[in-house]
Swiss-Prot record:
Residues 298-317 are annotated as: Disordered. The lineage of its organism: Eukaryota, Fungi, Dikarya, Ascomycota, Pezizomycotina. Pathway: Antibiotic biosynthesis. The keyword Amino-acid biosynthesis does not apply. The chain crosses the membrane at residues 21-41. It is a single-pass membrane protein. Keywords: Antibiotic biosynthesis, Glycoprotein, Heme, Iron, Membrane, Metal-binding, Monooxygenase, Oxidoreductase, Transmembrane, Transmembrane helix. It is an enzyme of class 1 (oxidoreductase). This is Cytochrome P450 monooxygenase sdnT. Belongs to the cytochrome P450 family. Cytochrome P450 monooxygenase; part of the gene cluster that mediates the biosynthesis of sordarin and hypoxysordarin, glycoside antibiotics with a unique tetracyclic diterpene aglycone structure. First, the geranylgeranyl diphosphate synthase sdnC constructs GGDP from farnesyl diphosphate and isopentenyl diphosphate. The diterpene cyclase sdnA then catalyzes the cyclization of GGDP to afford cycloaraneosene. It comes from Sordaria araneosa. Its EC number is 1.-.-.-. Heme binds at residue 505.
């Protein structure tokens, strides 16, 4: 009887269980609150970066910067942060933005040991393996933007370098000229109607890439739309800009898609695919894969039997993919996987960056009539006349038909306007972040410890008055034509238009060839009038940045 009584006393009641749960929950909440407060105090007052000025909330959590990135406010931050806090600003618990020539030289100088930061985990193309030490190991697939292995990256750049040199790229000018002719003809049919400038620049860029890389057209010019591909792709950068600021979360999402969806929903960066949406990457992948497969089969067959005489239809087209296939055949180090990835990378890396450049250039020139007028005078002095230009007796006036890539270098004012627009509205809207090496960083009388994420925002750096003059915030192409040689060299040196240090854009010459031909060609044929220029708050600027919301008219020149 006593045993039964003892057993009944040892069995807790529901009331006791409830009290225990409440007690444990209270302890957990208190412990969490104490830990949170302790972490906040440490980051705000005891952290090695605590003395660096910056927004107080930024010191506590990366959520501060992520909030602004999610809202597309990186243009505003780039223009205001350093104006308020000075050349060194703490923008996260372990991240610092800098804005000075000294900082630029330290971070982006060749051989200084500053590797890409963990922000780029959000841009990787392949799922990594993870070892027992929680270190990530990415496959060797030629992921140029997100490659963390410096030696591997240098090898990849050396391999593809000859294909993307200016002397090789310019042989594809005729393909770009054909696209320009079709774009001009189609824009003329609009008779000056208002258009979304970014969409039309994207149309032209994708058509140029299709022609240069694959001898193919997506049909965007004839359709007068990119099918929403530019907008949908840009939303992807909104997501990457947020995820990149939380590398631990990004790492976890490699192994848990559910966590990725949850985090996306939490930050409001989940974007459903529109109905009947057709990305251009699908036909690009199929067409490039088909040609590569045929070329590899032919190459394998040539090792076992004599080559039959080439028929006309068997000859390879004169495009970039043909060069990449030949590179694979000539160099074993340029593997089949490299070949397939590089064929797609031309589009993945090029369609948004070139669109961003063209949009900012046409927006700036179209909103500054005096600059546009001077460019037209320069084009006329070189014989580049509108295709519809006639004399007083209505007879066509013969002029230069196409603007040659090499000859474009003589259009000094036009190129100055191009540089100036890219300076003010760079392709990268956030910091080109790097990781401080073991030696640490001493700059502006501050020591920044190893492992800290540091970098310069191109938006900020390109408005630095020490480098670009007192009117650095103004659109003034003449700054690139000034007599002061040292000043011009400094502007070229401390410039992140094409990236920084050893990680500059590998497709720069391809992009320049397209931009240098498209801009003067469009201005020759049309008076570009910007009808809506959004203010800075309205522009959606992420890590990959574009001047959004610009409306313009292309009025045919008579």
């Amino acid at each position: 009887m006593e045993l039964l009584s003892l057993g009944s006393r040892q069995r807790p009641s529901l009331h006791e269980i409830g009290l225990s749960i409440i007690s444990l929950t209270t302890c957990f909440v208190c412990a969490f609150a104490v830990s949170f407060v302790a972490l906040a105090i440490y980051r705000a007052h005891l952290h090695p970066l605590a003395a660096i000025p910056g927004p107080k909330l930024a010191a506590l959590s990366s959520a501060w910067q992520a909030y602004h990135a999610r809202n597309g406010r990186m243009l505003v931050l780039g223009k205001t942060l350093h104006a308020v806090y000075g050349p060194i600003v703490r923008v996260g618990p372990n991240e610092v933005w800098l804005n000075s020539p000294d900082a630029f030289r330290s971070i982006y100088g060749a051989g200084n040991g500053y590797e890409k930061s963990d922000f780029y985990l959000s841009t990787v193309l392949n799922k990594p393996a993870i070892d027992w030490g929680l270190n990530l190991h990415f496959p060797d697939t030629l992921d140029l933007l997100s490659e963390f292995d410096t030696r591997r990256y240098r090898l990849q750049r050396r391999l593809v370098g000859p294909v993307y040199q200016a002397n090789n790229i310019k042989k594809f000018q005729n393909a770009v000229d054909d696209v320009i002719e079709r774009a001009v003809a189609q824009l003329r049919t609009l008779d000056g109607a208002e258009v979304d400038l970014k969409e039309w620049m994207h149309i032209i860029v994708v058509e140029c890439l299709g022609a240069v890389v694959l001898s193919w057209s997506p049909g965007y010019i004839a359709a007068e739309t990119d099918g929403g591909t530019g907008t949908q792709s840009y939303l992807g950068w909104k997501r990457k800009s947020v995820f990149g600021l939380f590398p631990l979360v990004t790492t976890a999402t490699f192994f848990s898609k559910g966590l990725g969806r949850l985090f996306s929903n939490l930050w409001g960066v989940t974007f459903p695919t529109p109905k009947n949406f057709k990305p251009f990457f699908t036909p690009v992948y199929h067409k490039s894969s088909k040609r590569i497969n045929v070329a590899l089969r032919q190459n394998a067959g040539s090792n076992t039997r004599p080559k039959p005489p080439k028929r006309k239809q068997d000859t390879q087209p004169n495009d970039l993919l043909t060069d990449l296939i030949q590179l694979h055949k000539a160099k074993a180090e340029f593997t089949e996987q490299y070949l397939r990835r590089m064929a797609i990378t031309n589009f993945g890396a090029g369609h948004e960056t070139m669109c961003s450049a063209l949009t900012s250039i046409m927006a700036m020139v179209g909103s500054h009539p005096a600059v546009q007028g001077r460019i037209i005078d320069e084009l006329g002095s070189h014989g580049y006349l509108p295709s519809t230009c006639t004399s007083k007796d209505q007879k066509p006036i013969a002029g230069q038909t196409h603007i040659d890539y090499d000859a474009a270098a003589s259009l000094t004012y036009c190129l100055a306007a191009i540089k100036e627009a890219q300076r003010l509205y760079p392709v990268i809207g956030m910091s080109l972040s790097r990781k401080v090496p073991a030696s640490g960083l001493s700059v502006h009388d501050v020591y920044i410890p190893p492992g800290t994420t540091v970098g310069c925002s191109p938006v900020s750096l390109h408005r630095n008055t020490t480098i670009f003059g007192d009117d650095a915030s103004c659109f003034n192409p003449e700054r690139w034509l000034q007599d002061n040689v040292e000043a011009r060299r400094a502007m070229e040196r401390y410039n992140l238009t094409w990236g920084g240090g050893g990680r500059t854009c590998p497709g720069r010459h391809l992009a320049e060839m397209v931009v240098w031909k498209v801009v003067p060609a469009l201005l020759r044929e049309f008076e570009v009038v910007v009808t809506k220029m959004p203010n800075d708050v309205e522009v959606e600027y992420y890590f990959m940045a574009m001047l959004t919301g610009v409306r313009a008219r292309f009025i045919p020149r008579r």
